[in-house]
């Protein structure tokens, strides 16, 4: 697969994960979400998948989007996958409501 096709495939998979996060979170408040174990596991798994997918982009693709905190995305993935017990779900909610929309917008812009 060519780099361009590979990057596009990864971008679309990340957008699918974001769509899942949006569906899981729609209409729910922080207190409700942070108390819901099923939500926690679903959201964290999608965030892990986003972090894992981000490692598969080519360096050129990553460099073209400096506004995205790639290192932080990968770092969260590592914490969530290996040190799940220390996750602060208030921070996860903040990520879902503040960071995911900007990631979505940047990924969508790359497809235009």
Regions flagged by a language model, labelled:
Residues 1-112:
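Solvent-exposed interaction patches of small proteins and small membrane subunits
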